[in-house]
From Swiss-Prot:
Alphabetical list of PROSITE patterns matching this protein: DISINTEGRIN_1, DISINTEGRIN_2
Disulphide bond pairs: 53-76, 67-73, 72-97, 85-104
Proregion positions: 21-46, 112-128
Record flagged with keyword Mitochondrion: no
Domain Disintegrin per the UniProt entry, residue ranges: 47-111
Physiological role: Inhibits ADP-induced human platelet aggregation. Antagonist of alpha-IIb/beta-3 (ITGA2B/ITGB3). Also avidly binds to the laminin-binding beta-1 integrins (alpha-3/beta-1 (ITGA3/ITGB1), alpha-6/beta-1 (ITGA6/ITGB1), and alpha-7/beta-1 (ITGA7/ITGB1)) in an RGD-independent manner.
Extra facts: Negative results: has no interaction with the collagen-binding alpha-1/beta-1 (ITGA1/ITGB1) and alpha-2/beta-1 (ITGA2/ITGB1) integrins.
Assigned protein family: Belongs to the disintegrin family. Dimeric disintegrin subfamily.
Subcellular localization(s) per the UniProt record: Secreted
Subunit structure: Heterodimer with subunit beta; disulfide-linked.
Organism listed in the record: Macrovipera lebetinus (Levantine viper)
Name of the protein this chain belongs to: Disintegrin lebein-2-alpha
InterPro entries in the cross-refs: Disintegrin_CS, Disintegrin_dom, Disintegrin_dom_sf
Amino acid sequence: MIQVLLVTICLAVFPFHGSSIILESGNVNDYEVVYPKKVTLLPTGAMNSANPCCDPITCKPRKGEHCVSGPCCRNCKFLNPGTICKRTMLDGLNDYCTGITSDCPRNPWKSEEDEMKWSATAKGSVLM
């Protein structure tokens, strides 16, 4: 049997609680069957290599780091305030990082109709 370690990527949606899953696979009538089996210990460095910013136990940024991922996060640190995180095509009202979060906040000068008007190319037809 071949065992494959399923490395859990550290995301808030799928928190890591000190255990992982080993997938045991085998062949049954030429079909590969995978059976999950819970384990509690991981090889040293297995989780550390998944995301260098993330503490594998708490699934939060490591000590001394600011963020794990996001458009305003690079090398585990928030990008400087004023860094463009979302460039617009027509109106020049780009979205900028704040320096205190990894999210890319919407430019407050944009109106709701601007977002609707230029967000995507329309395809299809109008029925009247």
